């Protein structure tokens, strides 16, 4: 049978995705390695764009968030057609805290969902938001209780099965009328690289602090 749905999820308890490899960012910036930064950013948008277009097939993509969803991880979730989150999940873009911005699709994906004003507020504050916060402004689609995410994914697939042909058509129309091109994503990657190479030493020190926090959070998820 043909694949009709894909689900992005995590096997790490309490963590969906903590975002990009900040240690690598610091190394590439210290070395003034523009090519390396472009290669990294391009590899990221390659993956997210394929998910965004349903891999070029009539596939509905779903992100199931059951924990921390930050930075590039949030961008990954946003690339799906449907975002389902458990209530304990948290969302945010911390990049502004070290004077950068998320450059692998965040603006494009958010703008199509919630418009410019809400997008720029989410990107420019560095705040961490609850799943209910994100549901209230239309960033995500469904919030369920802790441990109920898998069942909700199955239920969502079942609910949509009767109208699947029409829903696939609606998704195609959405991409045609208000779509995101690969060129748009790669253009923003170039803007991100330019901004990264302008970071000052104090910004890189702040980034290094977040590396330590990422490491601690990952270690905690593996213990549990």
Language model regions located:
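A structural preference for short, pocket-lining loop segments at secondary-structure junctions
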Residues: 1-33, 46-62, 86-89, 221-224
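Hydrophobic/aromatic residues within transmembrane alpha-helices
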Residues: 8, 21, 76-78, 134
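Gly/Ser/Thr-rich loops at beta-strand to alpha-helix junctions
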Residues: 14, 67-71
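Glycine-rich phosphate-binding loop at the start of an alpha helix
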Residues: 38, 71, 128
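Long amphipathic alpha-helix in the N-terminal Rossmann-like dinucleotide-binding domain
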Residues: 40-42
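Active-site-proximal alpha-helical scaffold in enzymes
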Residues: 44, 74-75
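Crotonase-fold acyl-CoA enzyme core
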Residues: 52-68, 79-90, 97-99, 103-164
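C-terminal alpha-helix plus adjacent terminal tail
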Residues: 155, 159, 165-224
């Amino acid at each position: 049978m043909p694949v009709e749905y894909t689900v992005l999820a995590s096997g790490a308890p309490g963590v969906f995705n903590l975002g990009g490899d900040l240690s690598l960012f610091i190394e590439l910036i210290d070395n003034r390695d523009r090519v390396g930064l472009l290669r990294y950013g391009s590899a990221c948008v390659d993956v997210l764009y394929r998910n965004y277009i349903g891999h070029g097939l009539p596939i509905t993509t779903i992100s199931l968030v059951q924990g921390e969803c930050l930075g590039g991880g949030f961008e990954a979730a946003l690339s799906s057609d449907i975002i389902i989150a458990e209530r304990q999940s948290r969302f945010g873009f911390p990049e502004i805290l070290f004077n950068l911005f998320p450059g692998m699709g965040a603006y494009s994906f958010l703008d199509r969902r919630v418009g410019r004003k809400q997008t720029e507020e989410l990107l420019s504050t560095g705040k961490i938001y609850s799943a209910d916060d994100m549901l209230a402004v239309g960033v995500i689609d469904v919030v369920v209780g802790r441990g109920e995410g898998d069942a909700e994914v199955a239920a969502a697939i079942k609910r949509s099965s009767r109208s699947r042909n029409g829903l696939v058509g609606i998704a195609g129309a959405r991409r045609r009328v208000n779509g995101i091109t690969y060129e748009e994503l790669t253009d923003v990657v170039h803007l991100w690289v330019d901004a990264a190479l302008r970071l000052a030493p104090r910004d890189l020190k702040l980034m290094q602090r977040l590396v330590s926090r990422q490491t601690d959070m990952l270690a905690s998820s593996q213990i549990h």
